[in-house]
UniProtKB/Swiss-Prot annotation:
Assigned keywords, A-Z: Amino-acid biosynthesis, ATP-binding, Cytoplasm, Glycosyltransferase, Histidine biosynthesis, Nucleotide-binding, Transferase
Protein name: ATP phosphoribosyltransferase
Membrane-spanning intervals of the chain: none
Catalytic reaction list: 1-(5-phospho-beta-D-ribosyl)-ATP + diphosphate = 5-phospho-alpha-D-ribose 1-diphosphate + ATP
Principal subcellular localization: cytoplasm
One family name in Pfam for this protein: HisG
Superkingdom of origin: Bacteria
Gene: hisG
Intracellular or extracellular location(s): Cytoplasm
Domain statement: Lacks the C-terminal regulatory region which is replaced by HisZ.
InterPro entries per the UniProt record, alphabetical: ATP_PRibTrfase_cat, ATP_PRibTrfase_CS, ATP_PRibTrfase_HisG, ATP_PRibTrfase_HisG_short
Amino acid sequence: MTAPLTLALSKGRIFEETLPLLAAAGVQVAEDPETSRKLILPTTDPNLRVIIVRASDVPTYVEYGAADFGVAGKDVLVEHGGSGLYQPIDLNIARCRMSVAVPAGFDYANAVRQGARLRVATKYVETAREHFAAKGVHVDLIKLYGSMELAPLVGLADAIVDLVSSGGTLKANNLVEVEEIMAISSRLVVNQAALKLKRAALKPFLDAFERASQNGV
C-alpha cells in the first residue's frame, strides 16, 4: 500500500486559510488542530495526511522529506532559507507586510540621517540585518520570539521589525509603521525528491491549489 502524502501546516491563520484550498481539491481535514492534541491529522482523502508544526519549521520538514509539501510564509522562507525547496505557487493567503515600527514621536528618519546606531528588536534577524545594511543604517539587533511591541515601550529597543496586518496592535501600543521591508504572503513549498518520485500523486493537489489561489478561493 502506498504511503499517503504528507502536508506540513502551522496552526492559526495559515491553517485556516489553507482549508479552502484543500476544499478546492475535494479534501477536508478530519480534526481541528486547535482542539485536537494530535500532531498528525487524517483527512477525508486516504492519500493525504496533515502534520502540524511550528511555522518556522515547515521548510525544514519539507526540505528533509518528512513532509512532501507544505505552506510557509515568505517571511519564514526568506529568514530561514528556502533555496532547497521547489516553490511553485504564491497562494495569496495570510497576506501582510514586514515593517519597521517605532514609538510615536520618535523621529526615525532624522535618526537615520544623523547616522545614529539603533537597537532593533525582531525575530527576523537575518532579514533585518540585510535590510538595514542595504540602507546603510547602523543597528544592533536583539532577537525576540514574541510580544515585539513591548520592546520599545520598556526601553529594550528603539524600533522593531515585525509583521503587520491591520496595524491595530501597533496603534494600541502607541507605535507607528515607518518603513515597509516587504510584502508577505504564503507559498506552497514542495520537496524536490517528492516532486520527481511522487509527481502523479502531487499534481492534482498542486493544480487545485493553483486554480484556487488564482480564483481567490
